[in-house]
Amino acid sequence: MIVEDKLKGLGLNLPDLDEQYRKNASGARFISHYAVQNVLYLSGTTPFKDGQPFNTGVVGQDLTLEQGYEAARYATLTSLAAVKYALGDLDRVQQIIQVIGFVNSAPGFSDQPRVINGTTDLLVELFGDRGKPTRAAIGCQGLAINHSVEIVMTVLFSGSEVRGPLGRDHYAG
């Protein structure tokens, strides 16, 4: 529980993944994760705080770079909630293999890498060198529910036990 202690020390909490999946405001259909041997592939996650979408909007228009950075940190917390759901313990993470970050960007905005630093900085704070991923930071025009950031993460883990995924296979009514 070392990683979770670090989270608490930073004043951060993992969101309730099951609650987010039950709400499914986007109507998207997918599963939370899929494991192949000791590699955990995660679906894209977006920033939530206190159960609500956090820092929504277009970075470089509605939001500053700093607000986008903070949104990336909160999207990372959602990814880590999926890792904990799957593995039961964040300390089983051996390496964050890859992060792909999408930034809902205004025309001409070119600081996507600095926005997605919010993700990698948090991962390094929590996991040290194990949190240094390969990475892409991609600007896009529009994300579901006007989210500012979406993170896709791939993780190498220890042990063999993996909980089955949560499914978003319905439309919220």
Residue ranges and their predicted role:
Residues M1-L77, A81, Y85-I97, S105-G173:
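N-terminal presequence-like segments and the immediate start of the first folded domain
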